A protein has these predicted regions:
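Extracellular distal adhesion/interaction modules in secreted or cell-surface proteins
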Residues: 1-340
Length: 340
């Protein structure tokens, strides 16, 4: 100990600043650090501790939990997903055929910090497609046995009614809220996106042309089979949102996935056609971007090299070709060419 201060146990310190009197005396600084450090803990710079306690009703900004057994949701992890339906062709490449705003909440038990359920709020923000499109979610890295139950909320009736559409390509189970006959976790989100908005397929919604409509949210609440986890069994990197549609007379639905998930192939009821991937190369027809992304207006190409100012995000094409370059392309729009 040093002076009247002593420390023992598994304690993690974050040091915001050290008084000048200490830093000017090497011997004193060493004694100070020895006094607060122990073999079970760590000393970190402010904000860099390896241990964090989520903020909540019982912890405030990180206090000792109380004895309550109730739950508190963490702040959401939020992203926007935008899709182009002309895969593997370029088309208008405006990335507004389907726009999803997604927020993920982890519901934790206050006392133990155990994750009880994970809630995905999937908001359908726009439908700029000229053909019927469905939306699904495959969660990679987990099994159906990892899920105790799936419940829904929000505007769920609008989304679920869309599975009655003649354009629906999902084998939707209205008890499990997952897709039948698929060993993977596949959760249908919308049988037909225009149907959710209450318009006919082909009607543009919230793209600057056509209809301006209210956005609707499908709450997907996944109760975990293992109720003792403190680390989530899946994260944004496992959320394989995709769009799908009927292609000619094919029995399987055509699916458009994020580039990051091409290696997983299609779901059991879908196809992506390997020749399409070969043709696509490094291009992409679905991207995950920061929440609230201002997507291109209808018919505005996301990126052009010939007339950059006529596109929505001139730097996008360079990022698509090499994802280590122009990684903040989405922060530099051509203002008059983006929506919201």
């Amino acid at each position: 100990d040093i002076g009247n201060f002593s420390s023992q146990g598994n304690i993690h310190y974050e040091v915001k600043e050290i008084d000048d009197d200490i830093t000017e005396d090497i011997w004193w600084e060493a004694k100070f650090l020895d006094a607060i450090k122990n073999t079970e803990g760590t000393i970190s710079k402010w904000g860099e501790s390896p241990i964090t306690i989520p903020a909540g009703d019982c912890t405030g900004e990180g206090n000792t939990p109380d004895e309550s057994g109730s739950e508190t949701p963490t702040d959401p992890v939020s992203y926007t997903y935008v899709f182009e339906d002309n895969f593997p062709l370029v088309g208008d490449y405006d990335f507004n055929d389907v726009v999803l705003d997604v927020e993920t909440y982890y519901h934790r038990e206050k006392k133990t910090n155990h994750i009880k359920r994970i809630q995905l709020d999937v908001t359908l923000a726009a439908a700029g497609a000229s053909k019927p499109l469905g939306v699904g979610l495959r969660i990679t890295g987990i099994n159906k046995s990892d899920i105790r139950e799936v419940k829904t909320g929000g505007d769920d009736s609008r989304f679920q009614e869309s599975f009655n559409s003649s354009y629906n390509k999902f084998r939707y189970n209205n008890v499990t809220y997952m897709e039948d006959s698929d060993p993977s976790v596949v959760i249908p989100i919308a049988g037909e996106v225009h149907n959710v908005f209450g318009v006919e397929p082909g009607e543009m919604v919230n793209t600057g042309i056509g209809v301006t409509a209210k956005k609707y949210t499908y709450e997907v609440i996944i109760e975990l089979a293992d109720q003792t986890r403190t680390e989530p069994p899946f994260s944004k990197d496992n959320l394989d949102f995709f769009i799908c549609y009927q292609y000619k007379s094919m029995e399987q639905r055509m699916e458009v996935h994020l580039y990051e998930f091409w290696g997983y192939g299609a779901t059991a009821a879908g196809t992506i056609q390997q020749e399409n991937l070969d043709l696509a190369g490094n291009n992409t027809w679905a991207i995950c971007v920061p929440y609230g992304f201002r997507y291109p207006k209808e018919t505005i190409n996301v990126s052009r090299t010939d007339i950059p100012e006529a596109s929505a995000y001139p730097e996008f094409i360079y990022w698509a070709q090499d994802r280590t370059q122009y990684t903040e392309w989405y922060e530099h729009p051509v203002e008059e060419n983006v929506y919201r």
